[in-house]
Swiss-Prot record:
Cellular component terms (Gene Ontology): plasma membrane
Protein name stated in the entry: Ion-translocating oxidoreductase complex subunit E
Subcellular location, record wording: Cell inner membrane
Enzyme Commission number: 7.-.-.-
Gene behind this protein: rnfE
Entry membrane topology: Multi-pass membrane protein
Any one of the GO BP annotations: electron transport chain
Enzyme class: translocase
Lineage, broadest ranks: Bacteria, Pseudomonadati, Pseudomonadota, Gammaproteobacteria, Vibrionales
Length: 227
C-alpha cells in the first residue's frame, strides 16, 4: 500500500495526470480560458474522483472481473449527475459556462484510470487519498493554465469569480492591465496547447535540475587478478 506522502508526490508532481499522463486534455484545453472556469471544473473533478474511488474500493470484492469497467462507468456517471445537479442549483452561472464539459467528466480517462488501476486494488482510505491528490494535481494545472490564459488574453484574474463563489466574490477580480482588444491566441485552443506545452517543458526542466543535484553513486571497480 502506498504511503500518504507517496500519494501526494505522485498526484501533484511525479505522476501528475495532466503533465505526465497527459489525460483529460479535452477539458483542460477547452475550459481553462479563465481561472473561475478552471477552478469550477477542477472542484467537480475532485468530487467525482474521491467519490468514485471510495465506492469502487468498497464494492470491489463484489464486482465480477468481466463487467468491472461498465460498473465503474455507471458509478462515475451517477456521481457526475449528482455534481451536475448541485452545480445547477448553487452555481448556475458557472453551470452554464462549463456546459457540456460537466457531463463529459464521465468519459475523463483520469477517473476511470484511477478506479481501475488503484481503487479496485486498495482499501478505501488510500483510494480516497489517491483520488484527492490526483484531483488536486489536475486542478492545480487547470488553474495555472487558466491564470496564464486569462492574464494574456484579458489582462485580468478571477474574472467571473461570483459565478462560482457568489456575489461577494466580485471583489476578487483583479485587472492587471487594460486591454482594448483581447489576445485571441491565448483565449483559443491553440493558445491552450502552447500553454500546456510550456508547463510540461517547465516541469521537465525542474525534474532535470533536481536529478542533477542528486548525489551520483560511484561506479564500482571490479579488479580482476590474472595469474
Amino acid at each position: 500500500m502506498a504511503s500518504h506522502k507517496e500519494l501526494i508526490k505522485n498526484g501533484l508532481w511525479d505522476n501528475n495526470p495532466a503533465l505526465v499522463q497527459l489525460l483529460g486534455l479535452c477539458p483542460l484545453l477547452a475550459v481553462s480560458a479563465t481561472v473561475t472556469n478552471a477552478l469550477g471544473l477542477g472542484i467537480a473533478t475532485i468530487l467525482v474522483l474521491v467519490g468514485s474511488n471510495l465506492i469502487v474500493s468498497l464494492v470491489r470484492q463484489w464486482i465480477p472481473q468481466e463487467v468491472r469497467i461498465p460498473v465503474f462507468v455507471m458509478i462515475i456517471a451517477s456521481l457526475v449527475t449528482c455534481v451536475q445537479l448541485l452545480m445547477n442549483a448553487y452555481a448556475y452561472g458557472l453551470y452554464l459556462s462549463l456546459g457540456i464539459f460537466i457531463p463529459l467528466i464521465v468519459t475523463n480517462c483520469i477517473i476511470i484510470g484511477r478506479a481501475e488501476s488503484f481503487a479496485s486494488k486498495n482499501d478505501p482510505l488510500p483510494a480516497v487519498l489517491d483520488g484527492l491528490w490526483m484531483g488536486m494535481g489536475m486542478t492545480a494545472v487547470l488553474v495555472l493554465l487558466g491564470a496564464m490564459r486569462e492574464i494574456l488574453g484579458n489582462g485580468t484574474l478571477f474574472d467571473g469569480a461570483d459565478l462560482l463563489l457568489g456575489d461577494w466574490a466580485t471583489i476578487l477580480r483583479i485587472e492587471l492591465f487594460h486591454v482594448d482588444s483581447h489576445f485571441l491566441l491565448a483565449m483559443l485552443p491553440p493558445g491552450a496547447f502552447l500553454g500546456v506545452g510550456f508547463l510540461i517543458a517547465l516541469k521537465n526542466v525542474i525534474d532535470k535540475k533536481m536529478a542533477d543535484r542528486q548525489p551520483k553513486e560511484k561506479a564500482e571497480i571490479e579488479r580482476v587478478r590474472i595469474s
